[in-house]
Amino acid sequence: MPLRGLAKAKNFTLGPTAPMKTFTENVHSQNNEINNLKKIDKTHNLTNNSQNEKLYKYESQIKSSFDRIVPTLKEIARIQHHEDFINTAQSISKQNLGINLPTHILDKSWVKPLDMRALYAWCAFKQHEKLSDNFFENDPLEGSFGSPNANNFETALLDCGIHLLDITPCSDGRLAHSVAYVMRIPFSAVRRRSHAGALFDIENTVNRWVKTEHKRYRENNPNEAHEDTRYLKIVTYHFSSVDPLHQGCAAHGSDDKLAAKEGSEKLLAFKEAVENSFCCGASVDLMLIGLDTDTDSLKIHLSSSDGKIDLENTISSLDIYNSTINFSKDEAEKEICQIISGNSNKVQLKGLDKFVYKLIVNNISQIDYVKKFHKGSYEDIGHAERFIGVGIGFKEVHLRNLTYFAHLDTVEEGAPDLDVGVKIFTGLNVSQDLPIPIVIRFDYSGKVPGAKERAAKDCYRVNNAISIRYKSLVDKGLLHTCLTIRDRDNIHSAQIIGMSLDQKTKEAH
């Protein structure tokens, strides 16, 4: 893929930057922890090694399918004037990528140079289609609705006093795997919507809370309304321990203190909105988590005595990993319990303490995942996404640096998120004369009459707005779009309803 190597460069940045806070000692401490991690040639006794092997196999399979696009197109470009070019090109594409190329583009190779930009975008879109088909048909992450993993996790959530888990990670592609990999949560058991800087829309989140509580009253789903459980809202911001000055959150100028502060403010505003708008003690639980995008370790912020989020006091999963690496399983579990609650018996853990315990144990497996398969710290410390996902949906995307998310209903309201994504891909792709692939998605409920048609209209509306906002890129063939819809009430993959690459029909005269 283009410019993937630049993601390794420590001075490479595409987002806006700002003066960093003075935390030199913390940076040195974090780097020392990473160096120590790399030296330890053993896995933690709490690590799920078999799960790690499955997850790595899936990650390798999907990413390699995208990374083979450029070498394949280079091979095809060299033979575009050969005899029987179209059949040979299709054979190469089928063998290397498992897809067919658009004949209406290949057909023109005898009169003008092959449109490699169009072919690149086509391949990216078709690989996403294959990813979606595989995800919903085969459940490679074993986290679909009704699966044993999902059922067990939902039961565990209720046992923690949580009836719904709602997570907002930053839209940065380095957090796209935060649910299924970093936290090891079955994707169907969590509500996930990414936003730049993890700065979610408060009104929309209140509306989702209302729908959740309504289902409890009307359907006893996931539990009865009188039961003492809460809606848990989590914000996941991110930082870089390897290059904190440049590879942190672009929306916050790589200032992780600012990212944590604004994430906390959003959470508290959401809680206040619920409490001010509804009676009878209505409230929610909150959690702020920092994710180190280099090691996938977590910093979980604790609640202060007045119920607010403590920005300074955190539990570090990497610290726990390093301090318990030589412990037996039982000893490590007791130590984690002691750190969380002050007692060493996990049976005595209650509520959010029990949930935090589960997160830390799960994340220890991910720390070992990065340690084993990525030498303790990811080589691509910066952006290396393969396409931009725009709209509402993308349940199937759970891999690091695969997709930059811009969740939106309209381009106007989602412009800040989308502009950041286009800026990132200007460095990754446009600088290499390759286009920005944008997959537009609107999920719909098949139970609602006319919902499918409205979702399709939303796709075309957003597509038109994108073509206007980024007209100069579109006119040069440096931005292409793929329009998709999906019925979220069924286990079906996304359906492509149109592309900017579709063959244009001649007008009748």
From Swiss-Prot:
Indicate where this protein resides in the cell.
Carboxysome
- The entry's keywords: Bacterial microcompartment, Carbon dioxide fixation, Carboxysome, Lyase, Metal-binding, Photosynthesis, Zinc
Q: Which reaction does it catalyse?
A: hydrogencarbonate + H(+) = CO2 + H2O
Q: Which GO terms describe its molecular function?
A: carbonate dehydratase activity; metal ion binding
Q: Which InterPro entries match?
A: Carboxysome_shell_carb_anhy, CsoSCA_C, CsoSCA_C_sf, CsoSCA_cat, CsoSCA_N, CsoSCA_N_sf
- The protein's predominant localisation is other
The source's superkingdom equals: Bacteria
Q: Which residues bind Zn(2+)?
A: 170, 238, 249
E.C. no: 4.2.1.1
The positions flagged as active site in the entry are 172 (proton acceptor)
* KW Lyase (keyword) present: yes
Q: Which GO terms describe its cellular component?
A: carboxysome
Q: Per the annotation, how and in what number is the cofactor bound?
A: Binds 1 Zn(2+) per monomer.
Q: Which cofactor does it need?
A: Zn(2+)
Query: What GO biological process terms are annotated to this protein in UniProt?
Result: carbon fixation; photosynthesis
Briefly state the protein's biological role. Answer: Reversible hydration of carbon dioxide. Essential for photosynthetic carbon dioxide fixation, supplies CO(2) to RuBisCO (ribulose bisphosphate carboxylase, cbbL-cbbS) in the carboxysome. There are estimated to be 29 CsoSCA oligomers per carboxysome.
Protein name in the entry: Carboxysome shell carbonic anhydrase
Organism of this sequence: Prochlorococcus marinus subsp. pastoris (strain CCMP1986 / NIES-2087 / MED4)
* Species classification: Bacteria, Bacillati, Cyanobacteriota, Cyanophyceae, Synechococcales
Q: Which gene encodes it?
A: csoS3
